[in-house]
C-alpha cells in the first residue's frame, strides 16, 4: 500500500474503470473526478455512476477506500470545440492527420482541474487512463506531454503532484488482463456490462466485450483487444 491519497480521472469507460481498480489496490483512500464537457452523448456520464455503485456494492475490499466523486462542469470546452465527440458529425481524419475525435486541450484541462481539486483535498497523486500503445495519436495522451504537465502543475501550485498512468505502455489486450488480475472475473464482467466506450453512445447491444455499435474506432479497439486477450494461452497454475 502506497502512502498518500489518489484522485482518479474517471469517465466511466474501460480504461478509467481499470485505473480506478488499480488505484484502489494501491492507495488507502481514492476519490474520483469526472467532466461534463458537452460530449454528444451523456451515456458515459450515466455509466460513471453505475460503475461507482457497482464497485461499492460488489467489491467489499475496495468499498471503504472509495471516497467522494467530483463532477466538474466543463461545458465551455464543448462550445469551443468542433470535434466528432462534441458535434453531430462523422468520424474521420482531420487535415492534421488526427481523427476528429481529438478534443484539443481536453486532457490538459482535465489534469489541471483535477490538480486544483486535489490541492484542496490533499490528493497529490492523479491517476489517468492515457495510453501510447493502442491510441489514436492524441498528443495529450503522450507520456512526454503528461510528464511536462506534471512538472508545470507542481511548480504552479507549489506542491509536488504525481501523475500515474498505469496503462501508458499496455495494449488493450494487456488492459483486459490487468483488470482480471486486479478484480478477477467479477471486475471483467463489470467492465463488460457497465462501462461505456462507444463514440456513438450505443447501449442496446451487448457483445462479449461490452456495449457498443461495434464499428466506431473506440469499439473496434476494445473488441480487438478483448479478442486478442481471449486468444492468449492461459498460464499454468
Curated annotation (Swiss-Prot):
The keyword Zinc applies. Keywords: ATP-binding, Ligase, Metal-binding, Nucleotide-binding, Queuosine biosynthesis, Zinc. Its EC number is 6.3.4.20. It catalyses: 7-carboxy-7-deazaguanine + NH4(+) + ATP = 7-cyano-7-deazaguanine + ADP + phosphate + H2O + H(+). CDD domains: QueC-like. Its cofactor is Zn(2+). Zn(2+) binds at residues 198, 213, 216, 219. ATP binds at residues 10-20. InterPro entries: QueC, Rossmann-like_a/b/a_fold. It is an enzyme of class 6 (ligase). One of its GO terms (molecular function) is ligase activity, forming carbon-nitrogen bonds. GO terms for biological process: queuosine biosynthetic process. SUPFAM superfamilies: Adenine nucleotide alpha hydrolases-like. The keyword Protein biosynthesis does not apply. Pathway: Purine metabolism; 7-cyano-7-deazaguanine biosynthesis. Pfam families: QueC. Binds 1 zinc ion per subunit. Belongs to the QueC family. Catalyzes the ATP-dependent conversion of 7-carboxy-7-deazaguanine (CDG) to 7-cyano-7-deazaguanine (preQ(0)). NCBIfam families: 7-cyano-7-deazaguanine synthase QueC. This is 7-cyano-7-deazaguanine synthase. It comes from Verminephrobacter eiseniae (strain EF01-2).
Amino acid at each position: 500500500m502506497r502512502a498518500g491519497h489518489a484522485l482518479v480521472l474517471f469517465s466511466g469507460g474501460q480504461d478509467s474503470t481499470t485505473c480506478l481498480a488499480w488505484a484502489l489496490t494501491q492507495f488507502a483512500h481514492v476519490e474520483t473526478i469526472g467532466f461534463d464537457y458537452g460530449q454528444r452523448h451523456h451515456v458515459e456520464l450515466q455509466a460513471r455512476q453505475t460503475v461507482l455503485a457497482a464497485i461499492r456494492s460488489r467489491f467489499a475490499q475496495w468499498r471503504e477506500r472509495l471516497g467522494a466523486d467530483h463532477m466538474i462542469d466543463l461545458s465551455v470546452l464543448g462550445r469551443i470545440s468542433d470535434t466528432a465527440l462534441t458535434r453531430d458529425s462523422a468520424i474521420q481524419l482531420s487535415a492534421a492527420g488526427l481523427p476528429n475525435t481529438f478534443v484539443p486541450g481536453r486532457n490538459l484541462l482535465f489534469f489541471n482541474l483535477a490538480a486544483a481539486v486535489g490541492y484542496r483535498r490533499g490528493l497529490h497523486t492523479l491517476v489517468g487512463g492515457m495510453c501510447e500503445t493502442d491510441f489514436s495519436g492524441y498528443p495529450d495522451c503522450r507520456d512526454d506531454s503528461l510528464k511536462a504537465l506534471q512538472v508545470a502543475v507542481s511548480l504552479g501550485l507549489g506542491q509536488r503532484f504525481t501523475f500515474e498512468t498505469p496503462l501508458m505502455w499496455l495494449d488493450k489486450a494487456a488492459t483486459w488482463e490487468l483488470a482480471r488480475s486486479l478484480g478477477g472475473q467479477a471486475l471483467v464482467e463489470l467492465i463488460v456490462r457497465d462501462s461505456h466506450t462507444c463514440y456513438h453512445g450505443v447501449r442496446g447491444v451487448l457483445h462479449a466485450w461490452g456495449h457498443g455499435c461495434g464499428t466506431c474506432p473506440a469499439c473496434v479497439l476494445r473488441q480487438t483487444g478483448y479478442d486478442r486477450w481471449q486468444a492468449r494461452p492461459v498460464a499454468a497454475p
